[in-house]
Amino acid sequence: MNELSDESILKYTKKISENATIDNWNDYKWQLSNSIKDVDTLENFLGITFDEKEKTEIQKAIDVFPMSITPYYASLIDIKNLGKDPIYKQSVASSKELILENFEMEDPLSEDEDSPVIGITHRYPDRVLFYINPNCAMYCRHCTRKRKVSEKSSNPSKEEIQKAIDYIKNNNKIRDVLLSGGDPLLLSDEFLDWILSEISSIKHVELIRIGSRVPVVLPQRITDNLVNVLKKYHPIWINTHYNHPVEITKESKKALDKLSDSGIPLGNQTVLLAGVNDCPYVMRKLNQKLVSSRVRPYYLYQCDLSKGISHFRTSVSKGLEIIESLIGHTTGFAVPRYVVDAPGGGGKIPVMPNYVVSWGSDRVILRNYEGIITSYVEPSDYGGCSKNCDTCDRMCIGDFEINQTGIEKLITDVDNSISLIPENNERVARRDD
């Protein structure tokens, strides 16, 4: 596990201030106040010198997409391997970000279009994304929300946050609230406590999730006081954002342990990034280190169509190759779900290798990770569903609502639909002529 010695830490702190100490280094507020935001500071901190052309190109990118790196995260950069270093690529601005493709978008997931009130994205029936803070400890170069991160105009007021909470209160189908940003854990303990208290008091909200990269880039933020705030509101889940095994350091592991020991389940959402983790063996090592740190791999995201990140995108086939190399080759719950977050707001679409080879009238032909092909004989007397939920003998506890959407209508026994037809289909329209 990566670990900085006290001597190395002092070397870095002295680059920032002659009077700085290890206690300063371990103070998240000191880390934030000394974030690296320009090329000169980066050169001084790392002890490197860019040539003038490269320095100018980096600065041009910063002028369009601001840079901010915590000293802690910058200390993980391998200065002997800058061109290939995964920490450097994720954190330092690049002229490649200025190459804009015509298919790239500021809001590729149409989060703003699915926003009924400021701060809320309501895409799925029973859950919402609650955008509570535009600020991040570090500005990831592959960020899908570059349009909002660090923008003061994107910072919701307390009144706007209250209106968003009221929206959740007034929609009793919402059972799951995801706090997002920016990074929710950069809010003050007191303000975060208030938000969590308000949401947890809503009877129909069953759980709260928090998406945060703080354990990765600013583990010092996971203080005892913050943990005491969070654990008051179980069930609360936290999804981290580790992209490479070198990010799991001693300091980061300590932060994860604090969260896990307080009873908070941890998941991880990785973005597939060209030149960073687009390798089956890097991804396997990452997920195995996560599991040993009590973090379950949750999603592997295909890189979005946001502006300025085309150099990070891989082919979808690369993602499938990685999943193929994980299934069967490592622990089952060390395999994330590979998804494409559909442009235009279609939501997360799982993409998986195909393990069904063929079907017969009474059997399914399957293959395993080794290439072994096998036959599974299906039951001959399976009766399916009576399609009458009022007389069903399945032990379904409590009230529930049948609200089928999309392919679910065609594949379940409850609905009699035989096809899904897009709106304005010309052939169907001719039937009415």
Swiss-Prot record:
In-chain residues carrying the UniProt-annotated modification N6-(pyridoxal phosphate)lysine: K348
Binding site for Zn(2+): C279, C389, C392, C396
Catalytic activity: L-lysine = (3S)-3,6-diaminohexanoate
UniProt enzyme class: isomerase
Disrupted gene: phenotype observed: Cells lacking both ablA and ablB no longer produce N6-acetyl-beta-lysine and are incapable of growth at high salt concentrations.
EC number: 5.4.3.2
Pfam families: Fer4_12, LAM_C, Radical_SAM
Cofactor stoichiometry and binding remark: Binds 1 [4Fe-4S] cluster. The cluster is coordinated with 3 cysteines and an exchangeable S-adenosyl-L-methionine. Binds 1 zinc ion per subunit.
Disulphide connectivity of cysteines: none
Keywords: 4Fe-4S, Iron, Iron-sulfur, Isomerase, Metal-binding, Pyridoxal phosphate, S-adenosyl-L-methionine, Zinc
Similarity comment text for this entry: Belongs to the radical SAM superfamily. KamA family.
Protein name per UniProt: L-lysine 2,3-aminomutase
Biological source species: Methanococcus maripaludis (strain DSM 14266 / JCM 13030 / NBRC 101832 / S2 / LL)
Gene field: ablA
